[in-house]
Amino acid sequence: MRRRLLVAVLVALASAVRAQQEVPEPREYRMDNYRAPVPAALSGARVITTEDAETIWRDKQGVFIDVLPRPPKPQNLPEGTVWRDKPRFNIPGSLWLPDTGYGKLAAASEDYFRQGLARASGGNSAVLLVIYCQENCWMSWNAAKRAMSYGYTNVAWFPEGTEGWERALLPMEESQPAPRPGDGKASPQ
């Protein structure tokens, strides 16, 4: 009798802990605390695992979009200071559209994201877009939700991102952000 009671209590406690860890899917974009546990779902999108992402990547079934932010060069650096951007290693062949996963985007960032998705998809709103960042990063959740709001109908959200990819010992490559309009740099893709 005591053993059954103990088992029942332990099961109830485990269920309570799991319930606390589950993050509900919000209706709106996440506006702050972007590095935090994410929900298990995104309405309208397919949520994929690292195994799913690897299959899509190997079979060239979709376009991979990395939305990890990139810190800007500080404006107040002393003259002569050499600035080196931190390298970004992501899934080979990805288009890196930094700073496009914030909850609210400036008009220029929104245009940059729209243009990047249009270029990546070849203007086809049914092309599979695999959107990712890092694990426990709301940037990818926001960006995938935003892509659907633009009319993209085949969006996959990869919440494990580059950390899940790297844990699976899959190849990574150093990447540069897609150029923003007017920055004068050649497009990486």
Each predicted region: which residue ranges?
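Bacterial N-terminal signal peptides
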Residues: 7-14
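Rhodanese-like catalytic fold shared by cysteine-dependent sulfurtransferases
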Residues: 17-51, 56-59, 75-130, 135-189
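Surface-exposed acidic loop/strand-edge motifs in secreted or periplasmic proteins
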Residues: 67-71, 76
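Short hydrophobic beta-strand that contains or immediately precedes a catalytic carboxylate
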Residues: 53, 63-68
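Bacterial N-terminal signal peptides that target proteins for export
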Residues: 1-6
